[in-house]
From Swiss-Prot:
Keywords: Membrane, Transmembrane, Transmembrane helix. This is Uncharacterized protein AF_2205. The chain crosses the membrane at residues 7-29. One of its GO terms (cellular component) is membrane. It is a single-pass membrane protein.
Length: 508
């Protein structure tokens, strides 16, 4: 009985926190100069930040045109970002909904850019934002929206914004930088199973839209929605395996998908889809804050010299970082005992703590031979009692002292020893944001928290030491709530938040 009352109290707290943004927003301005606490000396600038870039996908718009920046889903950048500023200007654009990721356009004829966002909360609206003055140009709400993960991921290609919503992919465009949003086309998934939704989306290296549904159907469709191909992981609407993350693609035609049981490479040859390989990993049950069972990460692709991997975190009670050989398995690879031979590494993620439990809902941040992940395991185990549909909302409490999770850990592949090792673990708290890093500044950035205040954290990529942080506010409206921290083309940090979009730039 006590557990029931505790779960009810938690649900009520979550509902109240959703109402707080409108009630308390007036206490914190939408634009302010933040004080930055200097902790340590910043790392030196990388003289060649583009050396670690994956092959460019020429069909993607701009420097960050899809959810995890590029088709490799690495979420890292070679471009400038705030390094060690004395002041940061914080700007907030209210959308009254939650955008998980932001896509930036190429410059228009006047040399200026816009940003596109898709939201996943109450409305599912699509918004177009003027980056010159950080203002809303237009917004539109698709028909038949239902709150959920469908619509969290998107692609911007050839000035067309592709967004999945339920069993459709919508294509939005415009006739100029300041013009209104126009619906350019709709692709409807054929022979839809009951409850089936398109979850993941990316762009192949031949310019096709690749997608995956929660029920395990993988597909590609042309940008004009004229031609498509499908590959079913499950047969006849069975749901033996489910998908709750986005997908990745590489230049050799591989499309990479993680289900709640296995990682797949689906080969696209320009005409049809076929299975390349399948490898099972260690999985587990859904827990507080998770969006689904199994892995909480979109597959990230890593190139480390001649070694090429798919990188995920698994679903074990003590989460592991797992690397899969992406191409042919080396002939002399002996494998890991008791695991699929395609697994190149499986290393526990402890975040530096002596605990037997960890997990993350974020994709793995990858740069060159390195990978980093954040801890999302909340400190209040009662949140695990919430029904599966309500568990993601436990992140509304993730900045509360005693509940907030702590820990970031970075790993590095040793090509000579063929081993993955932990190089540092930091006690910084990044409760629910997808982190990014700038190879130019050698800093990892993410929305974090300190003492209940939401912050922007800057962490030394080489050592894991906190370099500086900027306090934002304790308001629920400034909760990143699974959103990606991104580096914009102007060198500013952008992120979705519970009630809108935020930008943090060097103050004039």
């Amino acid at each position: 009985m006590r557990k029931r009352y505790a779960a009810l109290a938690i649900v009520l707290a979550l509902i109240l926190s959703l109402a707080l943004p409108e009630l308390l927003f007036q206490l914190y301005p939408s634009s302010a100069v933040l004080n930055v606490d200097k902790l340590l000396n910043p790392p030196p600038e990388n003289p060649n930040p583009f050396a670690a870039e994956p092959p460019a996908n020429k069909y993607l718009d701009s420097v960050w045109a899809e959810s995890h920046r590029n088709s490799y889903c690495q979420a890292s950048s070679p471009f400038e970002a705030p390094r060690f500023p004395e002041k940061l200007r914080f700007e907030y654009l209210t959308l009254r909904d939650l955008p998980i990721t932001i896509a930036f356009s190429e410059p228009y004829e006047d040399g200026k850019r816009v940003a596109w966002v898709s939201t996943v909360g109450f409305t599912g609206k699509i918004a177009k934002i003027d980056l010159e003055n950080f203002s809303l140009i237009d917004e539109i709400t698709p028909e038949g929206h239902r709150m959920g993960i469908s619509g969290a991921y998107s692609v911007l290609a050839n000035r067309t914004f592709f967004v999945p919503k339920l069993n459709r992919i919508y294509a939005y465009g415009d006739n100029g930088r300041l013009s209104r949003i126009e619906l350019k086309g709709v692709f409807e998934l054929p022979e839809v199973c009951s409850g089936e939704e398109i979850v993941g989306i990316t762009l192949t290296y031949d310019g096709m839209i690749a997608f995956a549904t929660n029920f395990g159907r993988v597909g590609v469709v042309s940008p004009n929605f004229g031609d498509y191909a499908l590959y079913p992981i499950n047969q006849n609407c069975e749901i033996a395996e489910t998908i709750s993350n986005s997908i990745a693609a590489d230049e050799s035609g591989g499309i990479y998908v993680v289900t709640d049981k296995a990682v797949y490479r689906i080969n696209w040859d320009g005409k049809s889809l076929r299975l390349g390989w399948r490898a099972e990993y260690q999985t587990g049950e859904q827990r507080g804050g998770r969006l689904g069972k199994g892995s909480g990460s979109t597959p990230s692709l890593m190139n480390c010299g001649e070694d090429r991997f798919v990188v995920i975190t698994d679903g074990q009670r003590l989460m592991h970082m797992v690397l899969f050989w992406r191409d042919e398995i080396p002939e002399d690879w002996k494998g890991i005992e008791g695991r699929d031979r395609r697994i190149a590494a499986e290393v526990p993620v402890t975040f530096g703590f002596e605990k037997d439990e960890s997990y993350s809902e974020q994709s793995v941040l990858v740069r060159n031979c390195s990978a980093a992940i954040t801890n999302n395991r909340l400190g209040l185990r009662l949140l695990d009692l919430l029904p599966e549909r309500l568990q993601p909302f436990s992140m509304l409490l993730s900045n509360v002292p005693g509940i907030a999770p702590y820990g970031v850990e970075k790993f590095e592949w040793d090509a000579e020893k063929r081993a993955l090792r932990s190089v540092w673990a930091s006690n910084v708290s990044i409760p629910n944001a997808i982190p990014t890093m700038s190879d130019k500044t050698n800093l990892l950035y993410a929305i974090g928290q300190r003492g209940g205040f939401w912050t922007l954290e800057a962490v030394n990529w080489e050592s894991g030491e906190a370099v500086w942080y900027a306090r934002i506010s304790p308001l629920p409206a400034h909760n990143s709530f699974y959103a990606a921290t991104e580096i914009g083309p102007d060198g500013c940090i952008y992120t979705g938040m519970l009630w809108g979009v935020a930008r943090l730039c060097n103050a004039d």
